[in-house]
Amino acid sequence: MKIQSIFAASFCLLSSISAHAAIQLTVPDEVELILVDNQEVKLESSFFSTTSTLDLENGKHQIVFRYNPVFKQGKDNIIVSSDIIVSTFSAEDKEISFKFPTYNSPEKAKAFNRDLNWELIDKNNNSIPFAQSQLIYNGMQVGRNIQFEVAKFNTTEHPAAFKEGMVTVTHKEIKNEQGDNTAEQMLHYWYEKADQATKERFLKSITNK
């Protein structure tokens, strides 16, 4: 009976582990992972490793990142930063990593913004399908509120838009990186998105205070 109980317990444990299996995303040093599902993330890495890892639940996810290859020129390190890329993919029980072209000079690496020829691959080198877009911002790059920009992007019908949890993230969890002006921007943005009845209720609530 004890042996049967041990086997039964082992089977339940294995079943539980299998049920909770997830995606492991490996992120190289040259990738600046800004947001995952419109949230900031903390990557796990060892001291001597040139990569970091992130565990995700099975299903659909959105990653927001920059590609920053580094080139040695004499005593200097030249960093070529891409535009911000928004990408959405779906996977289950996969070990996923980034794959980028090999560039031998900063000048050639600048072509990445035009070509966007990168991949997500599993451990067997199979490509993971994804949708992508560049998050272009024409104003001052310093102090950008990326979470706000991505939340706004996610209201569009672009294939890379991420609808899961969008409203919760937009209203409650966007960090105020630009002071009170960010709250004002969001207020104007969602007011314009509202229907006429909602606008009237909102204006009435302000008038009554």
UniProtKB/Swiss-Prot annotation:
Highest taxon above the source species: Bacteria
Key words of the record: Signal
Signal peptide limits: 1-21
Family: Belongs to the UPF0319 family.
Protein name: UPF0319 protein VF_1616
